[in-house]
């Protein structure tokens, strides 16, 4: 006999919830109505106050457990709704130019990445809790021709009174009172030499790779009768469990993923060349888009709890 799943609807005085959107309102308690075989049942559901939502938004949920008090979560592979991380401060976007050696005053040689800035880093939109449900500043980067944009994209930028730009990214902040549309953001005004930054970017794509290159596996013997040189070896037991566990390290596509390198030191800011030198390596190859933001340091700009 096929199982009959209950249907749920969640309503409060300020919002109705559904998974088609990514935000929720923050009532401390709402009522949960469900029906099984046509029999209505009403239960109370307590929600975390970390959820945010604008009025009249609808968020569909596949199923809700009344006992979960901190998060609303769907089944495996579904959407998990939680509070988005807030940046430590406003940042900018840049372009990776390459790497070089930097000599400090005492003669120490430091490997640095040179990051340049194309035309852009202009505020295109300021989002507030009253209008969008959260505080954020949208920044545009890298000018391009009008015909490269769609009409909605062009209208969005024209509304802010800015030039056509290729990339748009948001910096979620606690307060956005100091920012206005069409405001120019300069790296030398936001950061100084010695500051720590978090840099995000897309890693270099390597294509399909084996276990040795992708996961640093050790290869097998090349002599002594060995028939497996670069093979994985055992990937699990036999009849029990009778399948390969999820997450097993195996050959597959390597690289081409978004990553973040934290707490990199700014070694030099050259305003004449419009470049900045960052200690260490950053994701991607020369020409890659990078996102630079103040480093999150617990106890300094991020609360310990």
From Swiss-Prot:
GO terms for cellular component: chloroplast envelope; ribonucleoprotein complex; ribosome. GO terms for biological process: translation. It holds the Pfam family Ribosomal_L3. Belongs to the universal ribosomal protein uL3 family. Residues 1-84 form a transit peptide. The keyword rRNA-binding applies. Component of the chloroplast large ribosomal subunit (LSU). Mature 70S chloroplast ribosomes of higher plants consist of a small (30S) and a large (50S) subunit. The 30S small subunit contains 1 molecule of ribosomal RNA (16S rRNA) and 24 different proteins. The 50S large subunit contains 3 rRNA molecules (23S, 5S and 4.5S rRNA) and 33 different proteins. It is found in: Plastid, Chloroplast. Component of the chloroplast ribosome (chloro-ribosome), a dedicated translation machinery responsible for the synthesis of chloroplast genome-encoded proteins, including proteins of the transcription and translation machinery and components of the photosynthetic apparatus. This is Large ribosomal subunit protein uL3c. Gene3D superfamilies: 3.30.160.810, Translation factors. Keywords: Chloroplast, Plastid, Ribonucleoprotein, Ribosomal protein, RNA-binding, rRNA-binding, Transit peptide. PROSITE patterns: RIBOSOMAL_L3 (PS00474). Residues 228-256 are annotated as: Disordered.
